[in-house]
Regions:
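Catalytic cores of DNA base-excision repair glycosylases
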Residues: 1-166
Length: 166
């Protein structure tokens, strides 16, 4: 849903200045299909101000600076560092967490543990793309309820005890 919202927003406003010109209500009108859109719109406006005032209108290539932005945590910082700057980061979301624990590829009790294990086991040449593959696998095959184990290409490697074949 984020991609759909930004596909409508960016042709109209794709710079911090242009987004600020829309204001909170204007941003809301473009992102209302996203959960928590009210607080996210406010954070987007605050972030645009900070980008202009502290970073010359550019997104910083620095984890600490990214995580200091309103609404930006480790996962979002990892996504930005990976997709915008090509860093070998792995942003662990609910899909990746589920896939890694079900398959025992990189099990962990929390996203930080899963991320740490993934960074150790994923070969360097795959780190930039790995999180995209795992997200898609979790979103479309290894879904939360009734996973599609019968059509899973790694089913033979998976250690999930409650496999579903239908």
């Amino acid at each position: 849903s984020v991609n759909k919202a930004t596909a409508k927003l960016y042709p109209v406003a794709n710079t911090p200045q242009a987004i600020l010109a829309l204001g909170v209500e204007g941003v809301k009108s473009y992102i209302k299909t996203i959960g928590l859109f009210n607080s996210k719109a406010e954070n987007v406006i605050k972030t645009c101000r900070i980008l202009l005032e502290q970073h010359g209108g550019e997104v910083p290539e620095d984890r600490e600076a990214l995580e200091a932005l309103p609404g930006v945590g480790r996962k979002t910082a990892n996504v930005v560092l990976n997709t915008a700057f090509g860093w070998p980061t792995i942003a662990v979301d609910t899909h990746i967490f589920r896939v890694c624990n079900r398959t025992h590829f990189a099990p962990g009790k929390n996203v930080e543990q899963v991320e740490e294990k993934l960074l150790k086991v994923v070969p360097a040449e795959f780190k930039v793309d790995c999180h995209h593959w795992l997200i898609l696998h979790g979103r479309y095959t290894c879904i939360a309820r009734k996973p599609r184990c019968g059509s899973c290409i790694i089913e033979d490697l998976c250690e999930f005890k409650e496999k579903v074949y239908s």
